[in-house]
Amino acid sequence: MKILTKWLRAYLPGLSVDDPQLAEDLTLRGIAVEALFFVPTSVGKQKAQWNSVFEMDITTNRVDAMNHYGVAREAAAIYGLSVPDLRFDLPKPEHAASPFHVRIEAEDACGRFTARVLRGISIGESDDWFPGAEVATYFELLEQKKINNAVDATNFAWLAMGQPTHVFDLDKIEGGIVVRRARKGERLKTLDGVERALDAEDLVVADHARPLALAGVMGGWDTMITPATTNVLVEAAWFEPMAVRRTARRHGLHTDASHRFERGANFHAAPVASALVSRILLANGGWIEGELVDVRVAELEARTADRKPVALALSEVRRILGRTEDEEGITGTTVEGVLAALGCGLASQRVSESASQHDSDAAWLVSLPSWRLDLEREIDLIEEVARVYGYNRFANTLPAFGEGVRALPWAESEAAVRRTLLATGFHEAIASTFCSAAEASLTAPQPGLVVPLGNPLSEEAGVLRPSLVPGMLGMIAGNLHRDVSDVRLFELGTVFGGTTEKVEERPAVAFGAAGSVPEQGPLHPARAIDFHDVKGAVEQVLARFQARAVYFDRFPAEAGLTPAWLHPYRAARVAAEGATVGWFGQLHPSEAAARKLKEPVLVGELYLDRLYKLPLRKPMAREISRFQPVRRDFSLVLDESISWENIDQALAGLQIPELVDWRVREVFRDARLGTGEYSLLMGATFQAKDRTLREEDLQSFQAQVVEAVGKAGARLRS
């Protein structure tokens, strides 16, 4: 916004610094002057003059400084000056036959509404009607369009003191004023000429027959001021910020009034602004009929204007702000001077009954000014002390830190997973924590437990991700579509479940691969990546934890247990310690087609919360046996419903120290086997640490192995 320095100096006659210095000092105190430029102006036959204008960048929490008086108040605090209270004397009102009636029905959205009746007003072009304010010059320099003296008076009020006001043609109001919600089917033609269908949540200023204005946003066409207007109703009110924001957004409007009401206006400024507008309108004749009508809602007034005092201790100010370059540092007098200059009231109090009278024991109960809604806590007051005192006056010191850095409970486990996947050829990537509702329903482990966002950025980012898979698929597709043929990615992150009221978080890792495995020498040429490559990476991750029972299994497609994003016949479940810890396999063809992926993509996800509860497996050195190992092969026949994991678990339960290894050598399927059966060649290695195994030892071990696999559902092939 633009601030005219001539107008500022009208409030601060004792200000002696030049405009560039003023701009620098305001900027250092957080009231940023983005640019200082000089504008020539010539009004009438006067000689052209150069006037300086500040281009300000006021943060949204400082609505009190979005006007000339507010910036003058900041300058007064910086230089130790006093700024006069805004008071506008009006002529004594004439007696009204009956007082103007105002009623607030929407007590949750309108805390105060003032109305003043002016009669005999002449509507025309604005003259220099306000003492000390050359209106034509001011408006020209600030690029403010002049309309007529009534509308210009309301614009002058918000430029001067930041309080939006509105003027109605009184003769077009039926009965009194009612501040209420719009009713079904009501319509309102606003000052921009647009006829709007009102929503039941819209806040309106109405008379006894129809809506007259969108409260705090824009006035209505039917009651606007025209050259024929002689009787005027001046409105100055306080509207609840959220109510104004919602109404403005629904109708796609952003006005000077809504900009200020949305950020919180000064509850006590309404009567002052009303007096300012009235004084301007009465400059060319007319009179006031009746006293100012001032209707308030006690609950909103207590919440916004009459807030509880905040306790502030000098010791806390010094602890937070640290050492200054001045030897004396921040004193009680400094704190009192800064806060008083900002409009705060201070009541001194002792820290405790035994507190001494030293300056370090100073403490106050600070009453907050009604125009500073951004001040709520002790830390806010401390920030104000630092800001006005000057950030540049504090010494450069490092903050003290008394506690050690504590890592997350699973930091070591997470690092182990990361190192393992990096070592197996994967690259780490990071995706958004949001996804679409469709992706969430497809990949959520528990489909009903998806957490929607209250204010989503877009439909594609409408829920918290219940799985890392959507982000992983997006990253793989993005690489493949950009001619990156060989992709291996993983992401370590958090997934979300539960409900909006109780969101549950759990760590997870997703991984995806496509393309080929690079050549690893003449005996290992490049080849397409397959299911077993990904399975090997999963095994490496699981091997880092001391999980006793780790196995992989798959379910018939008819069972419907495989996640919808995986190929029903090319996927596996990962289990550890008797619980599911993840899934992996080839991406479902329909999902691949939806993402325009022409080559097979392998993807998976592990839920790490269960694994993180297990201790990490520590590398241990063991003595290598000096005695010869002996391998025995077992040709087994199994039903298709029995997997290798069943055999693996059966052998793991054997109490045979000499059984040091067992693994699949070959899988064979043939019609000559029984229906629904397959053959598996298993190799078992026996080795003792203290002797050479004899034939009778091996026969005993073999018998135990055959018995164990038999209990698991396998039989020796004849």
Indicate where each model-derived feature is located.
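A carboxyl-terminal module marker
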Residues: 2, 10, 19-21, 341-343, ...
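Short histidine-centered catalytic/ligand-binding loop motif
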Residues: 140-146, 259-266, 457-461, 513-531, ...
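Class II aminoacyl-tRNA synthetase-like tRNA-binding/catalytic domains
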Residues: 178-218, 222-225, 393, 398-507, ...
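His/Asp/Glu-rich mid-to-C-terminal helical/loop segments that flank catalytic regions of hydrolases
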Residues: 268-284, 475-488, 699-707
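Long hydrophobic segments that form regular secondary structure
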Residues: 287, 333-349, 362-366, 479-483, ...
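Short glycine/threonine-rich loop-to-helix capping motif typified by GTGT followed
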Residues: 299-318, 368-380, 405-414, 441-449, ...
